[in-house]
Regions:
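Alpha-helical hydrophobic/aromatic positions enriched in membrane-embedded helices and signal peptides
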Residues: 11-13, 40, 69, 74
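Signature of N6-adenine DNA methyltransferases within the class I
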Residues: 20-26, 33, 49-55, 65-194
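Conserved SAM-binding motif I beta-strand of class I
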Residues: 14-19
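Short, conserved SAM-binding/catalytic segment
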Residues: 29-40
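Short, solvent-exposed loop/turn segments at the edges of secondary structure
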Residues: 10, 39, 180-184
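Conserved SAM-binding strand-loop segment of SAM-dependent methyltransferases
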Residues: 38-49
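Conserved SAM-binding loop of SAM-dependent methyltransferases across substrates and taxa
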Residues: 1-10
Length: 194
């Protein structure tokens, strides 16, 4: 039992959850809250993912003191995300245009032309690489639309530049989420070591 307690405590102290919207954060907080010994803050925060980089300071409430505690976002061994299905025309996501331009410039330097019609999640998949440790794994739920488009070809080339692609899983039989109009793809990506 002590080993389980140590593993559970380690998971609790090293699991960070973030979203741009408050409802998913409320659900995450409720899911993490029922613990016997709550002696460290829940690492749940609201922020646009394009504004999160290693070293970004985030404030949490320490449950044992009630005081605000700042913690720096680390690099992660694992990132899991159900990415937003927002099209390429979005303007409401802060820093999106800047990050998109940076990634397009990086692609050009590698001889890859990222298509202007790539959706937000494509850039998010590429952006997450900077939050992973070398050899870290990203497990990302996306739309499958990029698999069948010209824009998807250059996106795949950029993924292959940054990551070892461990797998792309698609269910061609049914939608994973009943209210969505698109089929899903699950990407499992391992950040390449320099």
């Amino acid at each position: 039992e002590p080993v389980m307690d140590d593993a559970a405590d380690r998971a609790y102290r090293t699991t960070w959850l973030s979203d741009i919207h408050d409802f998913p954060l409320q659900v995450a907080t409720l899911a993490l809250s029922p613990r016997e010994h709550v002696d460290s803050p829940l690492l749940v925060f609201q922020k646009n993912a394009f504004e999160v980089e290693p070293g970004t300071m985030v404030d949490f409430i320490d449950p044992s003191t009630g005081e605000e505690v700042g913690k720096a976002v680390p690099r992660f061994d694992t990132i899991a995300s159900n990415l937003p299905y927002v099209d390429f025309n979005t303007k409401e996501i802060g820093r999106y245009s800047q990050i998109k331009d940076e990634l397009k410039q990086e692609a050009r330097a590698a001889g890859i032309k990222l298509h202007d019609r790539n959706d937000l999640y494509c850039y998010f998949c590429l952006y997450l690489e900077r939050l992973l440790n070398d050899g870290g794994v990203a497990c990302l739920l996306t739309s499958n639309t990029w698999l069948f488009s010209q824009a998807g070809v250059s996106f795949f080339e950029m993924l292959a530049l940054k990551y070892q692609i461990e797998g792309i899983f698609v269910n061609g039989q049914a939608r994973w989420f009943h209210k969505t109009k698109v089929m899903n793809a699950l990407l499992v990506l391992r950040k390449k070591k320099p």
